[in-house]
Amino acid sequence: MAVSSSQSQPAKAAVLLHEVSAQQLAQAYDRNTVAADQQFKGKRFKVTGTVDSINTDMFGNPYITLRGGVNQFMEPQFELKKSHANYAATLQRGMRISLICTGGGDIAKIPMSQNCVPDA
């Protein structure tokens, strides 16, 4: 039985990947940070949204903001793996994209996600 469970586990993980829009993610953190952390922080999920900006942090890591925040200054942020910098370079504001990310909690109610990769 244990062998059967472990064999089916990878397939279940792919099927159970939580899907959310950037707006739903932002609203979840705006409503209740503790509940949103329990749902997203440290977990992989698929997020879809419209690119608002493409940036680099102070360490040169590329990150994207997607529209959907509770206001224009609180758009959710998605840090890409450095190996996907070329992907970030192809993006333009207004493009609709999907990413697979790990939730990183929030900073002042702004949802932060990390280790993001483009959804194939």
Show where each model-derived region lies:
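OB-fold and OB-like single-stranded nucleic-acid-recognition modules
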Residues: M1-A120
